[in-house]
Amino acid sequence: SFSCLAAIAGEVSFKITKQYLNFPISHKENRGRMTFEVNGKPDLSVVIRLAPDEAEYWVFKDVSAFKGKTIKITYDGNEKGLSKIYQSDEIEGQAELYKEKNRPQFHFTTRRGWINDPNGLIYYEGEYHLFYQHNPFERDWENMHWGHAVSKDLIHWTELPDALYPDHLGTMFSGSAV
């Protein structure tokens, strides 16, 4: 259900009541800068191809840590897509995840977005940990986060929340130090 507090040109605000914000993506659009503020404090800034009309696919941001707070999103791209962002306790298209045509079934893939460069491959307390570069906001290179997944057998993987996010110093590339 759509639960938006306010939408004006280039920005929209949500009082967070659900786990995810879902975003429509179209590669016909140029990337625009999207900035998230939580209760007036900067949280994240990414570039994204927000679909003003029909989405080619959807991406999401887990906002469960912000329940009860207000998130303001500003966007300098085609602002028509802002009205299509919505909250839900499910990822848009969740029923079809891992069933998509051409989706690898043996190797790890993320639910949404682009992945590259496995990093920090470790075995710890009975689980294999895979960290990798991740753009959770589209299927091309950009917005470097470090994704995280775990497995007990190196075949069946559970995707965890991203471990590292872009911050005021920049994005999280391979070779970044913590």
At which residue positions do the language-model features occur?
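Carbohydrate-active catalytic/glycan-binding domains of CAZyme proteins
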Residues: 8-178
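Bacterial N-terminal signal peptides
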Residues: 1-3
